[in-house]
Regions:
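Bacterial N-terminal signal peptides that target proteins for export
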Residues: 1-8
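C-terminal motif of bacterial Sec signal peptides marking the signal peptidase cleavage site
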Residues: 15-17
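Bacterial signal peptide processing site
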Residues: 19-21
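Acidic, low-complexity proline/glycine-rich segments
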Residues: 25-68
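A cross-kingdom marker for long, charged
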Residues: 25-42, 225-308
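Long acidic/polar interaction regions in large eukaryotic complex-forming proteins
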Residues: 28-31, 35, 39, 90-183, ...
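Extended amphipathic alpha-helical scaffold segments
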Residues: 64, 68-110
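A contiguous, surface-oriented mixed alpha/beta subdomain in the mid-to-C-terminal portion of proteins
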Residues: 153-267, 277
Length: 308
C-alpha cells in the first residue's frame, strides 16, 4: 500500500462536534422468508450436485444475497441509520460480483456460495444485536454497532468499522466453513484475490454515493487525510489477504484447543483494529456530529420523497 492513510485521519480536519447523540436503531426482521428458507438447507461446502441455489453456487445465489441485502439496506437507509453506510458499500460490492462475475472470475460457483455463507454472518450478528443477544455478537461487531447507534464516529468510521468486523473477523470463519477449494477441487485463491480488483472498480463510485446520501463532507475528509479510493481499496484488500491466511490457520489446527487459540487470535486482531478505527474516526476529530449528519440525511430523504 502506498500509505496506510487510516492513521493520518486523526490530523485531517479538527472539527469539534457537539458530543455523541443516540440514534434510534431501525427494526429489521430476522431475515426475509425466502432467505431463511434457503439458508436452512444450504450445505457448508459448495457441491455441483446440490439442489440449493447457493449450495451449487448458481448465479441465482448472488441474486438471493443481493435481494436480502437490499431488503435490509432499504430499512436502514429509510431511517438514516448509521449502519446504512457499511450496508451500502457491502451491497455495491456484492452487486459487482453478480454483474462482473462472468468476465472477472474463472469459476463463480465457489464465490457465489461463499458470498452467501459470508453475508449470513453479518445478518446474524446484526439480528442478534437488535434482539439484545449481545453475548452472541462478536466484539468487533459490538464496537461497530454501538458506535453507529450512539453516533460517535464519522461516515468513514461506520464504513471501516463494518468492513473490519466483516472482513477481519467474519471472513476467516466463512472461508474455513466453505473450504478453500472450488467444487472441481482446484484452489479458490485465484478468484478470491480477483475480488480485490472488483473492489477497485466500485470503491470510488461507492464513496461518492456515500457522500451524497449521508455526509457531503466525506470527500473533504478523505482528501485532507490523503486517503483516496485506491487507498481504501488497498486497505480492504490487505485485510482480505490476512483473512485467507487466518482461514488456513483455522483449517490447519489439529485439535479443538488449537483451533480455539487461532479463533481467539482472529477475534483479538479484529477487536484491536476496531478500537483503533473508532478512535481515529471519532466525529469529534473528523466531524460532523451525529445531529448534523442526521439532519442532512433526513432533508435528502424528504426531497427524494417529494420528487417521487
Amino acid at each position: 500500500m502506498r500509505r496506510l492513510g487510516l492513521c493520518s485521519i486523526a490530523a485531517a480536519v479538527a472539527i469539534a462536534g457537539c458530543g455523541p447523540a443516540s440514534v434510534t436503531p431501525p427494526s429489521v426482521s430476522a431475515g426475509g422468508a425466502s432467505w431463511k428458507a434457503m439458508i436452512r438447507t444450504m450445505p457448508a461446502v459448495a457441491t455441483l450436485h446440490s439442489t440449493n441455489i447457493c449450495g451449487d453456487g448458481s448465479p441465482a445465489c448472488i441474486d438471493a444475497v443481493v435481494a436480502e441485502m437490499t431488503r435490509r439496506f432499504d430499512v436502514l437507509n429509510a431511517s438514516c441509520s448509521h449502519e446504512a453506510p457499511f450496508a451500502l458499500l457491502y451491497l455495491r460490492v456484492t452487486e459487482g460480483v453478480g454483474i462482473q462475475g462472468a468476465r472477472r472470475f474463472r469459476n463463480r460457483d465457489y464465490l457465489n456460495h461463499l458470498d452467501a455463507v459470508f453475508a449470513n454472518l453479518y445478518f446474524t450478528a446484526y439480528d442478534n444485536w437488535r434482539a439484545g443477544r449481545t453475548k452472541l455478537v462478536p466484539e468487533a461487531w459490538r464496537i461497530a454497532f454501538q458506535a453507529a447507534d450512539q453516533g460517535t464516529v464519522s461516515v468513514l468510521g461506520d464504513i471501516l468499522l463494518g468492513m473490519n468486523a466483516h472482513i477481519s473477523r467474519d471472513l476467516p470463519f466463512a472461508l474455513a466453513r466453505a473450504g478453500l477449494r472450488e467444487p472441481n477441487g482446484q484452489s479458490a485463491e485465484g478468484d478470491f484475490n480477483r475480488v480485490n480488483g472488483l473492489l477497485g472498480s466500485v470503491t470510488a463510485d461507492s464513496l461518492a454515493e456515500e457522500a451524497t446520501r449521508y455526509d457531503p463532507t466525506l470527500g473533504t475528509v478523505l482528501q485532507a487525510a490523503r486517503l483516496y479510493p485506491v487507498d481504501v481499496q488497498q486497505l480492504l484488500a490487505g485485510w482480505r489477504s490476512n483473512s485467507w491466511n487466518d482461514a488456513e490457520r483455522l483449517l490447519a489446527a489439529r485439535t479443538p484447543t488449537q483451533r480455539a487459540a487461532v479463533a481467539r487470535s482472529i477475534e483479538a486482531g479484529a477487536t484491536g483494529r476496531a478500537r483503533l478505527i473508532e478512535a481515529v474516526t471519532s466525529n469529534l476529530v473528523t466531524g460532523p456530529d451525529a445531529a448534523v449528519r442526521n439532519a442532512y440525511c433526513e432533508r435528502r430523504l424528504r426531497k427524494s420523497t417529494a420528487r417521487s
